[in-house]
Amino acid sequence: MINTNPKRSNEPPVWLLFSAGGMISALAFPVLILILGILLPLGIISPDGIIAFAHHWFGKLVILVLTIFPAWAGLHRIHHGMHDIKVHVPSGGLIFYGLAVLYTVVAIWGVASI
């Protein structure tokens, strides 16, 4: 018999944000460490170029992508990691994903004010 009222899950959109954050972290953070941690202190790259990039609309988009998606990945990992170690927080999904949404809003506001 076919269930005409299937239960919907919020997991697919959350897994999309989680996987995007993991991929961005793996690919972009080594480059950021190279640029901000090595090339900038050695004087190979000027801070003026980085500031100009951050003020451009594309730079703001890059900053948002590099902050929002890894935050979703981290909070998703914490949420599921707590389940793995048998620490069940009441309304854990609401708390952790709510924090991710709050962080997203704060990040958008912060980057928009640059």
Curated annotation (Swiss-Prot):
Membrane topology: Multi-pass membrane protein
InterPro entries named in the record: Fumarate_red_D (IPR003418), SQR/QFR_C/D (IPR034804)
Family matches, as CDD domains: QFR_TypeD_subunitD
Gene Ontology MF terms: succinate dehydrogenase activity
Alphabetical keyword list: Cell inner membrane, Cell membrane, Membrane, Transmembrane, Transmembrane helix
Transmembrane segments: 24-44, 49-69, 94-114
Disulfide-linked positions: none
Gene Ontology biological process terms from the UniProt entry: fumarate metabolic process
Major localisation: membrane
NCBIfam families linked: PRK05470.1-1
HAMAP family cross-referenced by the UniProt entry: Fumarate_red_D
The protein's name: Fumarate reductase subunit D
Organism (species): Actinobacillus succinogenes (strain ATCC 55618 / DSM 22257 / CCUG 43843 / 130Z)
